[in-house]
Amino acid sequence: MAVVDVSEELKSLSSTMESIEAVLDLDRLRADIAVLEEQAAAPSLWDDPEAAQKITSKLSHLQAEVRKAEALRGRIDDLGVLFEMAEEEDDPDTRAEAESELAAVRKALDEMEVRTLLSGEYDAREALVNIRAEAGGVDAADFAEKLQRMYLRWAEQHGYKTEVYETSYAEEAGIKSTTFAVQSPYAYGTLSVEQGTHRLVRISPFDNQGRRQTSFAGVEILPVVEQTDHIEIDESELRVDVYRSSGPGGQGVNTTDSAVRLTHIPTGIVVSCQNERSQIQNKATAMNVLQAKLLERRRQEEQAKMDALKGDGGNSWGNQMRSYVLHPYQMVKDLRTEHEVGNPEAVFNGEIDGFLEAGIRWRKQREK
């Protein structure tokens, strides 16, 4: 890379970083951190464990955001010095190191820029992920379990906490459905582009004749409800069923009827929870999931009105959005953004950042 090109590239990186810093508003974030640090230092903090957890989690996230921005700014500034050293010493190794760091900084900057695109009303929230097997029999159930593992691995790789609320296992293999939380700020904004129908094409391991099978699984992403959302549920409009928790193959995992299924009669929405220790805890968690589904229903109704005004079909639950092809070739391709990866195994192991970033940029472009 010529000296002039390097100079222009560094100016471009610095300019992009300035734009990102303006959107993030680092001074405001530092002020928010100071307030949260004061709250976290209060002797009464853990009198309310749930509130304490939210305060410490948000504090940790904001501190990480600021550190990440400051570190990236430092790396951009250091790049200029590194390239100057390479030129002065005429050292190929130093120049190679500088160019490698330049590529790494450019990638980190792209990732941070994507974060600034998460400006929707609920984007900063934690997320509830609901996956269900659709057409395709046992292959669909197996596919749904693969998707569950994919998202849980993605969260683990990023250091995000997760909690599985409910998993309904299929008889032969895989799962009928699952609901779990991704407990990190901006999890909803990041994962919401995953909502829709996912398609798997492969030679079925469950077919004795080794035939190719196409199966489908639906992914629903919900924002975690907060008190300010005012989602009220009339207990008289609920049907509450209790049952015994079960594991793979229908095996009982609890000797008491602690699992809870809630049916919201006006909308027909059904949610369940079986992973908490008691029936009371399972009902409370199921209520949280139901509130999230009702909030999402309200959001979709509002979005449908906007789409009708714009003549836009939107991105509904039933829209097919990604294909995972394992035979006759190997390719995972997003049908909206055209982003594709030729290594399905890596994708199923949680390497989906490229799809998420492409989806967020695609969504932002559609909003213009």
From Swiss-Prot:
Family: Belongs to the prokaryotic/mitochondrial release factor family.
InterPro entries: PCRF, Pep_chain_release_fac_I, Pep_chain_release_fac_I_sf, PrfB
GO cellular component: cytoplasm
The species this protein was found in: Streptomyces coelicolor (strain ATCC BAA-471 / A3(2) / M145)
Signal peptide span: none
Highest taxon in the source lineage: Bacteria
Keyword Lipid biosynthesis: no
Subcellular location: Cytoplasm
Molecular function terms, GO-annotated: translation release factor activity, codon specific
SUPFAM superfamilies: Release factor
Key words, A-Z: Cytoplasm, Methylation, Protein biosynthesis
Modification N5-methylglutamine, positions: Q251
Gene3D superfamilies: 3.30.160.20, 3.30.70.1660, Release factor
Post-translational modification: Methylated by PrmC. Methylation increases the termination efficiency of RF2.
Protein name, as recorded: Peptide chain release factor 2
General function of this protein: Peptide chain release factor 2 directs the termination of translation in response to the peptide chain termination codons UGA and UAA.
PANTHER family: CLASS I PEPTIDE CHAIN RELEASE FACTOR, PEPTIDE CHAIN RELEASE FACTOR 2
Gene encoding the protein: prfB
